[in-house]
Amino acid sequence: MDEGQKQQFIKLTYFLGEVLGEQYEIVFHVITEDGAYIAAIANNHISGRSLDSPLTVFASELMQNKKYLEKDFLCDYKALVGKSKLIRGSTFFIKNHDKLVGILCINHDTSIMRDLICKMIDLEKIGDMGDILGNISFSQNDSSIETLSHSIEDILVQSVDSSYLNSDYQLSITQKEEIAEKLYEKGIFNIKGAVPIVAKFLKISEP
């Protein structure tokens, strides 16, 4: 992606943030040879992320599996903020021919609307409809769940057995190889800055 194209998508990111409103987070990722990074983010109060936050594991796997060669975009999948807040996510693949050069993500925070509906249901005393609403609202593409992480360290916590994260735990060579292979399969090394952090965690030198 050249600088001119990059600047156009940065402007588009903030434009969509203004047009769609505060319940929509817009995130523009640039994909380079050095990895992916956030170039612009609008309404980031929804996830709490910043320009320094990494690409998500979900998006990294899409890159690693070259999903962008099969589809131009993905719509209406689950995205998780923190431990319990569910929002709706959609991803548009920015391609120069068949080469992925960027990703534009739109995350819709429906929590206010959902809370309002649940309160209305509660006022009407309609049994457990609030729980039913929570269960069916993400029925489409239910198998796809994205976690919006603030740092590469957060991604390691999601991806690696928690017992290995103990600083006193001594990883064997086999365990290090297995962890590195798992992170590769998830596309973690597509994230800019991931290699030195993973190398430090595994206590190995950078390749």
Q: What residue ranges belong to the model's regions?
A:
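Juxtadomain coupling helices with adjacent low-complexity linkers
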Residues: 2-10, 15-19, 102, 108-169, ...
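Short, glycine/acidic-rich beta->alpha junctions
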Residues: 8, 86, 190
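Structured interaction and signal-relay segments at domain junctions
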Residues: 17-82
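Short secondary-structure junctions and interdomain/linker hinges
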Residues: 19, 23, 27, 163-167, ...
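Sensory/regulatory domains in signal-transduction proteins
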Residues: 62-123
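Conserved mixed alpha/beta catalytic, RNA-binding, or beta-rich assembly cores of soluble enzyme
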Residues: 90-93, 124, 157, 173-181, ...
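Phosphate-/nucleic-acid-contacting segments
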Residues: 172-207
